[in-house]
Regions:
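Sec/Tat signal peptide C-region and signal peptidase I cleavage site
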Residues: 23-27
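Long, charged/polar, surface-exposed segments that mediate recognition or autoinhibition
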Residues: 109-180
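Bacterial N-terminal signal peptides
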Residues: 13-22
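Short, low-complexity, Pro/Ser/Thr/Gly-rich segments in the mature regions of secreted, periplasmic
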Residues: 204-221
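Intrinsic-disorder-associated interaction segments
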Residues: 10, 40, 51-58, 62, ...
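Bacterial N-terminal signal peptides that target proteins for export
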Residues: 2-13
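N-terminal leader/targeting segments
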Residues: 28-131
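A cross-family detector of function-defining hotspots
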Residues: 73-110, 162-202
């Protein structure tokens, strides 16, 4: 792959990632009790949970999360998160992203006042079609399967940091379960204790996974 193609692929991925993040990746949320899994394909669009003014945050800054992750998983090192410039001047959030490879990015929604994480995300962006040498369908399918496996591995690693009592195998099963149940859905969520897991499957445009804190009510405690 030539330099021009790599540059185009990088610009394409960065642009699409920015669009997906600024378009409120999880803009569809059905009404569901906190103890139930839920998915929506034709629900009314509402404000994503982490965008609400009273949305809780993890007691963790981006730097602290990255240090903890890289120490725990030195073979899956996350590069520094870079701030994403958006037109949301009055937004209470700061968005930042870290490139993992050509198709996978990690991003965060940071509370601007507290500087702690509201939403921690992984986004898989399929590479744009090659203009120079079209790939065979079977090669594309093979590459996509491998890319999705990497996504699932990072999902499992993220989950394990917030569920330290769970084995990595259990977290891997959880990641695969989320991807399967959220397949084809613009919003799929599972709430477990103080955590919300979200899958936003945009089909050929990519998949975003998020892990977010939940503010428990008195009845939940």
């Amino acid at each position: 792959m030539g330099h021009d193609t790599l540059t185009k692929a990088g610009i394409f991925s960065a642009t699409l990632l920015t669009l997906m993040l600024s378009n409120t990746a999880f803009a569809v949320e059905p009404n569901a009790s906190s103890s139930e899994s839920s998915s929506a394909k034709h629900s009314e669009t509402v404000v994503a949970p982490y965008l609400r003014e009273d949305a809780p945050t993890f007691n963790l800054t981006v730097a602290q999360f990255r240090e903890k992750f890289n120490t725990t998983y030195p073979h899956m090192v996350l590069a520094e998160y870079k701030t994403i410039k958006t037109l949301e001047v009055k937004s209470p959030l700061i968005r930042a992203a870290s490139r993992i490879n050509n198709t996978l990015y990690s991003s965060v929604a940071i509370d601007k006042s507290q500087r702690t994480i509201r939403s921690l995300q992984l986004t898989y962006l399929p590479p744009p079609p090659s203009e120079e040498k079209p790939e065979k369908p079977e090669n594309i399918a093979k590459a996509e399967k491998a890319d999705r496996a990497v996504l699932a591995n990072y999902m499992a690693a993220f989950i394990s940091l917030f569920e330290p009592t769970s084995t990595l195998e259990k977290c891997q099963n959880k990641a695969n379960e989320l991807l399967e149940k959220g397949k084809g859905s613009p919003f799929y969520q599972q709430k477990e204790g103080t955590l919300r897991f979200v899958i936003a499957d945009h089909n050929e445009k990519g998949i975003t996974f998020a892990i977010e804190p939940i503010k428990l009510s008195l009845s939940d405690k």
